[in-house]
A protein has these predicted regions:
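C-terminal segments of enzyme domains that contribute to small-molecule binding surfaces
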Residues: 2-45, 52, 145-178, 207-236
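N-terminal segments that cap or nucleate solenoid repeat domains
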Residues: 41-76
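Flexible, glycine/small-residue-enriched loop-and-beta-strand segment within the central core
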Residues: 72-82, 87-178, 207, 215-216
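C-terminal/domain-terminus segments
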Residues: 81, 86, 176-212, 217-226
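Short flexible/disordered coil segments
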Residues: 130-137, 189-196, 232-236
């Protein structure tokens, strides 16, 4: 049709310009184009879920300034409690019983498997990228079959609550097994393997992890300063 009009109408360019303007006028006055919700515009440009989308996910409870990536995977959200000022990055997996305090960052590709015993992250906790925290696991000794597709009669499931207390920092690529507690102020270096409770305000590294040195406790003073600041009041 276009080629025919080129032959029959030497002014075909003006014809197409007329068509273009007519379509623009029709689109401008259409109801669909006239009403675009503000939230929808914002959502399209955001990598995090909006307030209404967070509500639709079905968390048991969540606080203010909660940033959950649209690329994160959340399973059993009805078992999860999220405090204030939380960020969960791309490709994280959260499953089962999980309780997060406030001022928490869970970095990309990190996995938290809460099971029924649960994972608790208190306040000011950082879990770096590609970490795995398990409150439930299988017996790998060979005495039992293992993986989630095996009937429970043929498995030995190992469960234990995992707790990361205030100010805990976990370095990239680290693994934490069921039943472990990282006491207040513990720092775990990159690529560490944690299978037992770690003592407060100490730095550990390695696989299995070992004590390196005591950790500076200045974070406590900085927390107090933050909580007395205008930024803290605005975030509540």
């Amino acid at each position: 049709m276009i080629e025919i009009r080129r032959v029959d109408n030497p002014e075909y360019a003006e014809y197409f310009e007329w068509i273009y303007r007519k379509c623009c006028r029709a689109l401008k006055h259409s109801e669909a184009a006239a009403f675009v919700p503000v939230e929808k515009k914002q959502n399209a440009n955001s990598s995090f879920f909006s307030e209404s989308e967070l509500k639709a996910i079905g968390f048991l409870k969540y606080g203010k300034n909660v940033l959950v990536s649209r690329k994160a995977s959340i399973y059993n959200p009805e078992q999860m409690v999220l405090g204030d000022n939380i960020r969960i990055d791309d490709f994280c997996i959260l499953s089962g019983n999980i309780k997060l305090g406030s001022y928490i960052h869970i970095s990309a590709y990190t996995c938290l498997i809460g099971g029924t015993k649960g994972i608790v992250l208190q306040d000011f906790v950082t879990v770096s990228s590609r970490c795995a925290v398990y409150a439930v696991s299988d017996d790998f000794s060979g005495e039992h079959l293992n993986n989630s597709m095996i009937p429970t009669a043929y498995r030995r499931v190992i469960e234990g609550q995992v707790i990361l207390e205030d100010y805990v920092s976990v370095g990239t690529g680290s693994i934490i097994l069921p039943g472990v507690k990282l006491e207040e102020g513990v720092a775990v270096g990159a690529m560490s393997f944690v299978k037992h409770t770690l003592e407060r305000w100490k730095i550990y590294v390695g696989a299995p992890c070992r004590y390196v040195k005591d950790r500076n406790q200045n974070m406590k003073q900085l927390r107090a300063a933050l909580q007395n600041s205008d930024a803290y009041e605005e975030s509540r």
